[in-house]
A protein has these predicted regions:
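N-terminal secretory signal peptides and thylakoid transit peptides that target proteins
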Residues: 1-12
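Bacterial N-terminal signal peptides
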Residues: 10-21
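Sec/Tat signal peptide C-region and signal peptidase I cleavage site
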Residues: 22-26
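Extracytoplasmic "Venus flytrap"
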Residues: 33-52, 76-83, 105-108
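Signal peptide-proximal N-terminal region
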Residues: 51-73
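Short beta-strand elements in bilobed, periplasmic/extracellular small-molecule ligand-binding domains
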Residues: 66-79, 135-139
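Short, well-structured alpha-helical segments in soluble
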Residues: 74, 82-99
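Extracytoplasmic ligand/sensor domains, especially the bilobed periplasmic-binding protein
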Residues: 83, 97-151
Length: 151
């Protein structure tokens, strides 16, 4: 239960942080990118993450959205293919104009999309632990790094 509330809070913060990337004219929705493998070898792990983000978006929208605007999920399948992940990330940021993206399950995926988010000055929420020693103002690393874990 606490994890679900944490995810909802992160989604709201991410959506709010991404509002500055929106055009000045009024919009009815705030687009949220979901960048996960829904096919291929990683689908077994990442499909659940996609479902969790969709559930959080539904709950936020049921309570009035963010600043009165509904969140609109834009789901893409990166098919467990890291070069494809970079292409899909670019599509989310450039064509779909998402305010924020939740995605990737592996460090290989994160490293392949990182240049896209940094170049576009867009925001990626990375949901799992990682090896550390990487810092980007465009990524929220929500999982622990090795120096944050106790044996």
């Amino acid at each position: 239960m606490q994890r679900r509330h944490s995810l909802k809070a992160h989604a709201a913060v991410a959506a709010l942080a991404g509002l500055s990337a929106l055009p000045a004219h009024a919009q009815d929705t705030i687009k949220v990118g979901i960048l996960h493998s829904l096919s291929g070898t990683m689908a077994i792990s990442e499909t659940v993450l996609k479902d969790t983000v969709l559930m959080a978006i539904d709950e936020i929208n049921a309570k009035g959205g963010v600043l009165g605007k509904k969140l609109e999920p834009v789901v893409v399948d990166i098919a467990s293919n890291w070069p494809l992940a970079a292409e899909k990330a670019k599509q989310l940021v450039s064509q779909d104009k998402v305010a924020v993206t939740f995605g990737c399950w592996t460090s290989s995926c994160r490293k392949s999309v990182l240049p896209v988010y940094e170049e576009a000055n867009s925001l990626l929420y990375y949901p799992v632990q990682y090896e550390g020693e990487e810092l980007s103002k465009n990524v929220f690393y929500t999982g622990a790094a090795p120096n944050q874990q106790a044996i």
